């Protein structure tokens, strides 16, 4: 941790009577520690400064970070705005649901949400579409004997999303290339010159948006077809509000972004946990054999409680979204502090996911906390998907594909008489921001 903080910046100071975490570097602030060791940074700040403190996010400025459980309520607060997200990442998230509030957010969300509910996913045949793609990929892993897990789950998620969108197989390499260039917008310096990440990222975004507009035109020309994109376009066109195609295209692009990176990380962590805890693998195999096939409908998921518990516990212990930025529109009372209007806020989901105030034995990976529960799932139990008006619209889609993946993995590997084994260390190379993921080099064997 010490090497990730600036040893020359030790001065204790206040902003609006709230302490600023020492150790920020010029230009990049606390980003090295936020990216590489966020859990320890949050614990150190809480221990030395209390529950409210400022972190320096470099180009995004200072965000007032609160580890008091009251901060979770900010996600539902009417005087807290998500518009700060667009200001931090305008090139990627401008005009999307995650950066909108109030009436604009409701209009856009209402126009497409039906396609993402269990009934909509079932009618569109999404489970039937995904199952053979997932089976083929895990069979390839079995045949190879070992894989570098995060790149593999990333490629699988891209294949699922492109299949969802109807991208022809021969076009997949081009889409892969443009998508990788699009991701450069996350970290691109604001220098727009030929050959630099900002120029390449913008060009890739424009190319992808042009393809998505063609998908929208095709969906309208073949309105009788089923599928998630067709259903999104149909629901969008039936909306009572006059909404532009720019909004529709931006949110289909958001589906591509959100559906790939975060889900691939969760999928990789699921395999890692199965590899390092043989009892989890045995329980999953037993369930998969009882079910006998990869589920394809949401109604089938209740037959897979172990796979669902694996999905939920992985999200809790290894949340792919660790921090959420917000802006206070009015003066707020947050715990024992008054927060001025206009304050930029950081809600540390990672901290709450592993808080002893919210979870029993939070550092233990335990499926029993889900399998033995009798009460319904609470908002705090799925905080990785957000809550209130901004709860993730893809929640049911992620739930379906990760349970499908778990069952397919167990059936395929058990039939071959093999199980996942961890071939490398886990802690080195982890990243926590802008999204969290395990090391890109972790290898999993099947033997």
From Swiss-Prot:
Its EC number is 1.14.14.-. GO terms for biological process: sterol metabolic process. InterPro entries: Cyt_P450 (IPR001128), Cyt_P450_CS (IPR017972), Cyt_P450_E_grp-IV (IPR002403), Cyt_P450_sf (IPR036396). The keyword Oxidoreductase applies. Its cofactor is heme. Heme binds at residue 392. GO terms for molecular function: heme binding; iron ion binding; monooxygenase activity; oxidoreductase activity, acting on paired donors, with incorporation or reduction of molecular oxygen. Keywords: Heme, Iron, Metal-binding, Monooxygenase, Oxidoreductase, Plasmid. Signal peptide: none annotated. It is an enzyme of class 1 (oxidoreductase). PANTHER family: CYTOCHROME P450 26, LANOSTEROL 14-ALPHA DEMETHYLASE. Belongs to the cytochrome P450 family. Cytochromes P450 are a group of heme-thiolate monooxygenases. They oxidize a variety of structurally unrelated compounds, including steroids, fatty acids, and xenobiotics. This is Cytochrome P450 BJ-4 homolog. It comes from Sinorhizobium fredii (strain NBRC 101917 / NGR234). The lineage of its organism: Bacteria, Pseudomonadati, Pseudomonadota, Alphaproteobacteria, Hyphomicrobiales.
């Amino acid at each position: 941790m010490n090497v990730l903080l600036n040893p020359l910046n030790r001065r204790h100071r206040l902003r609006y009577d709230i302490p600023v975490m020492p150790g920020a570097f010029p230009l990049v602030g606390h980003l090295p520690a936020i990216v590489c060791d966020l859990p320890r940074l949050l614990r150190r700040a809480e221990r030395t400064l209390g529950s409210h403190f400022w972190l320096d996010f470099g180009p995004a400025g200072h965000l007032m970070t609160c580890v008091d459980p009251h901060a979770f309520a900010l996600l539902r607060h009417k005087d807290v705005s998500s518009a700060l997200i667009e200001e931090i990442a305008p090139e990627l998230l401008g005009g999307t649901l995650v950066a909108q509030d109030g009436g604009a957010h409701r209009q856009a969300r209402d126009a497409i949400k039906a396609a993402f509910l269990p009934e909509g996913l079932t009618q569109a045949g999404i489970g039937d579409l995904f199952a053979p793609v997932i089976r083929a990929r895990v069979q390839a892993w079995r045949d190879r004997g070992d894989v570098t897990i995060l790149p593999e789950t990333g490629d699988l998620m891209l294949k699922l999303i492109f299949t969802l969108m109807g991208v022809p197989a021969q076009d997949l390499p081009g889409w892969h290339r443009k998508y990788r260039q699009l991701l450069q917008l996350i970290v691109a310096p604001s220098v727009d010159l030929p050959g630099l990440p900002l120029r390449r990222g913008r060009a890739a975004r424009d190319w992808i948006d042009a393809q998505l507009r063609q998908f929208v035109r095709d969906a309208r020309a073949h309105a009788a077809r089923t599928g998630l994109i067709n259903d999104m376009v149909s629901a969008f066109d039936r909306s009572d509000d006059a909404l532009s195609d720019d909004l529709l295209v931006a949110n289909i692009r958001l589906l591509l972004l959100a559906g790939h990176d975060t889900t691939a990380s969760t999928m990789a962590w699921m395999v890692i946990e199965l590899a390092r805890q043989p009892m989890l693998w045995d329980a999953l195999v037993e369930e998969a054999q009882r079910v006998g096939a990869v589920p394809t409908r949401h109604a089938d998921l209740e037959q897979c409680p172990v796979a669902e518990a694996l999905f939920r516990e992985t999200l809790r212990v290894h949340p792919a979204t660790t921090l959420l930025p917000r802006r206070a529109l009015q003066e707020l009372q947050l715990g024992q502090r008054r927060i001025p209007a206009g304050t930029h806020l950081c809600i540390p989901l990672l901290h709450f996911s592993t808080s002893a105030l919210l979870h029993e034995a939070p550092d233990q990976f335990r499926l029993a906390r889900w399998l033995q529960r009798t009460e319904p799932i609470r908002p705090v139990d799925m905080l990785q998907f957000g809550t209130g008006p901004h709860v993730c619209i893809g929640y049911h889609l992620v739930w379906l594909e990760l349970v499908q993946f778990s069952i397919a993995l167990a059936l395929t590997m058990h039939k071959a008489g093999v199980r996942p084994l961890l071939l490398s260390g886990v802690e080195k190379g982890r990243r926590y921001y802008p999204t969290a993921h395990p090391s890109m080099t972790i290898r999993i064997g099947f033997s």
